[in-house]
């Protein structure tokens, strides 16, 4: 669905008049105005150094629709910046890793008199517009053009806990934005791409909220199409394993025989390929790229996590092959090889949780590691698995930890959930919708790996796996 939304506030500006007039609609069309009195109901920007920062209130996916009136000399040059946080919209390219990756979010453009023009296609909440010439320009309105999934849900949280209700609402918005344009993306700023492994928690959320959706099947089919055997999905062999896990869960949930039958020949070929990723002694291939999640990257537990994902995938493959009367010999053989090496996680909570999902086992020592330090060590990608593993022993504690972890993002201004978040980032930092020079920038001063600073996505679909946890454990 495409919708047009007004800004909710004017954050800042210079050399501007009538800025608050942008907060009310004067129509989605351009008009010629010869009455100077009417110009008082339009934003006026005049001269080099004139700028305005608008807040649209929530994370959006799209751009801005600018409706202009009179402009001195009929056209003028503007600089437009989009930001998921107020910090991001206020800096220059390269500053704290601000960039134009996956979509331009900081650029110069030309606007003309009496025009109705849309600019940008990215993820944002804030927009800054700078006038770059010694001219004036009148804006009748500046709308956000937002694209968001609009389907009737089969599930919404109806309980009385306001914190859980807000977490559900924000997680739903996160995945609604990421699934709004035909495929399920990682994020709406970045990555505007389909990553097969990252689909797992996103599809959990979509299945929980809406049931069976065409956008999910299109995305699974595209992942397969882009990785003909002998390629792995996204060049990462664990991501091909996640495709199997998703497929097995999808069949269990919807009993969609016709759809699954179309995947079986690829699945059989993929098993032959995956067989080469583990030798007869259970040692994993380390030459081809693998990933558990970013906080696990390079840790002592990373390969244990790969092994757990491998086992989950083979469990799923056996279930699918059995259901359709096909040989399970290859999947069983791979599973036997994987189990020749112990699944012993030393420190990472997400790896302990994956091991629990792979084997159904959780020792007292592992449970103690899961709960030690509260939400320290949580990751948004693996939130469903970690919270569910804790809930297998103590559901009430798991719910409280969910409220603490996701609630902390809400308390700092989140309107969608983030690519990553560590509770330690809260110390000495501010909100994403404010700039406080006495505090660290929660967006620009943190991050890791490929999401350092303002490259960090504040609307990342993999964070929405918490929806399934809420549906399963936070009963109405």
Where do the language-model regions lie?
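Active-site core of glycosidic bond-cleaving carbohydrate-active enzymes
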Residues: 195-201, 205-476
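Short, charged/polar micro-motifs that form catalytic or ligand-binding hotspots
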Residues: 56, 117, 192, 206, ...
């Amino acid at each position: 669905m495409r919708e047009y939304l007004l800004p909710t506030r004017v954050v800042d500006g210079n050399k501007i008049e009538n800025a608050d007039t942008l907060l009310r609609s004067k129509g989605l069309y351009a008009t010629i105005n010869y009455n100077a009195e009417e110009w008082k109901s339009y934003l006026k920007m005049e001269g080099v150094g004139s700028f305005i920062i608008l807040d649209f209130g929530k994370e959006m996916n799209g751009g801005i629709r600018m409706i202009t009136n009179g402009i001195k000399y009929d056209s003028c040059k503007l600089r437009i910046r989009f930001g998921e946080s107020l910090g991001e919209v206020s800096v220059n390219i390269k500053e704290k890793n601000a960039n134009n990756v996956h979509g331009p979010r900081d650029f110069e453009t030309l606007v003309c008199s009496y025009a109705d023009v849309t600019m940008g296609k990215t993820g944002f909440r804030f927009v800054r517009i700078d006038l770059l010439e010694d001219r004036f320009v009148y804006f009748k309105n500046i709308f956000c053009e937002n694209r968001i999934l609009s389907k009737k849900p089969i599930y919404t949280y109806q309980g009385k806990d306001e914190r859980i209700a807000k977490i559900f609402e924000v997680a739903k918005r996160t995945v609604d934005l990421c699934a709004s344009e035909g495929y399920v993306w990682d994020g709406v700023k970045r990555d505007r791409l389909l990553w097969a492994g990252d689909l797992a928690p996103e599809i959990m959320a979509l299945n929980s909220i809406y049931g069976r959706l065409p956008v999910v099947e299109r995305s699974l089919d595209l992942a397969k199409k882009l990785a003909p055997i002998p390629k792995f999905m996204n060049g990462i062999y664990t991501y091909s394993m996640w495709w199997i896990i998703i497929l097995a869960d999808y069949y269990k949930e919807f009993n969609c025989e016709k759809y699954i039958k179309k995947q079986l020949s690829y699945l059989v070929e993929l098993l032959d390929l995956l067989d080469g990723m583990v030798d007869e002694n259970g040692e994993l291939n380390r030459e081809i790229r693998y990933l558990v999640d970013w906080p696990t990257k390079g840790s002592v537990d990373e390969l244990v996590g790969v092994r757990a994902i491998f086992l989950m995938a083979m469990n799923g493959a056996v279930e699918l092959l059995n259901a359709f009367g096909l040989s399970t010999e290859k999947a069983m053989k791979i599973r036997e090889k994987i189990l020749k090496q112990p699944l012993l996680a030393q420190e990472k909570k997400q790896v302990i949780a994956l091991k629990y999902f792979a084997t159904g086992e959780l020792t007292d020592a592992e449970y103690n590691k899961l709960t030690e330090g509260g939400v320290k060590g949580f990751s948004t990608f693996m939130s469903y698995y970690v919270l569910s593993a804790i809930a297998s022993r103590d559901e009430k504690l798991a719910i409280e930890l969910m409220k603490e972890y996701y609630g902390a993002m809400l308390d700092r201004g989140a309107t969608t959930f983030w690519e990553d978040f560590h509770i330690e980032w809260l110390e000495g930092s501010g909100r994403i919708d404010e700039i406080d020079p006495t505090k660290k920038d929660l967006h620009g001063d943190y991050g890791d790996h490929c999401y350092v600073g303002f490259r960090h996505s504040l609307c990342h679909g993999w964070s929405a796996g918490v929806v399934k946890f809420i549906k399963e454990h936070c009963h109405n």
